[in-house]
Amino acid sequence: MVRRFKRAVKYRRGSRTHGWGRVGQHRKSGGSGGKGMVGFHKHKWSLVMKYGESGTGWPFYGKHGFKQPQAISIEWRPINVGTLAEVVRGLKREGRVKEEGGRYVVNLVELGFNKLLGGGDVDLPIVVYTPAASRSAVEKIEKAGGEVRIVPAVHR
């Protein structure tokens, strides 16, 4: 990037204060009116009026939200019952799904999902092992002759 001006430091060698007046006037936080957010209700009020929202003073005052720690946040990977029925049909063709008592047994965690939702229709009797399921999904699976079993699982 092209420099548009030469730094004044080069030409101020030996001048002791480099154009900042008395020694100490360019040190610490006194010359700038205080550290950080100091003075926004006093001598820096004009900055609040200029840059803050009218009436609220945002972003200088008030609460500013909350960022949930990653350790407790859950990354949901849902699947609808209609999509699950199609997946089970595909797994049945490949011979990768277990069948017990005329019902297909599916573990959603092994398939990469952790929640069952109620979108779509299901006509296969499926026993689903999942960490979480919606009420409508459970109703649709049971209506088709299947069952939903909630199992504890690590969400991450």
From Swiss-Prot:
InterPro entries: Rbsml_uL15_N (IPR027386), Ribosomal_uL15 (IPR030878), Ribosomal_uL15/eL18 (IPR021131), Ribosomal_uL15/eL18_sf (IPR036227), Ribosomal_uL15_CS (IPR001196). Residues 1-35 are annotated as: Disordered. One of its GO terms (biological process) is translation. The keyword RNA-binding applies. It holds the Pfam family Ribosomal_L27A. Residues 1-16 have a biased composition (Basic residues). Keywords: Ribonucleoprotein, Ribosomal protein, RNA-binding, rRNA-binding. It comes from the Archaea. The keyword Glycoprotein does not apply. One of its GO terms (cellular component) is cytosolic large ribosomal subunit. GO terms for molecular function: rRNA binding; structural constituent of ribosome. Belongs to the universal ribosomal protein uL15 family. PANTHER family: 60S RIBOSOMAL PROTEIN L27A (PTHR11721), LARGE RIBOSOMAL SUBUNIT PROTEIN UL15 (PTHR11721:SF3). Binds to the 23S rRNA. Part of the 50S ribosomal subunit. This is Large ribosomal subunit protein uL15. The gene is rpl15.
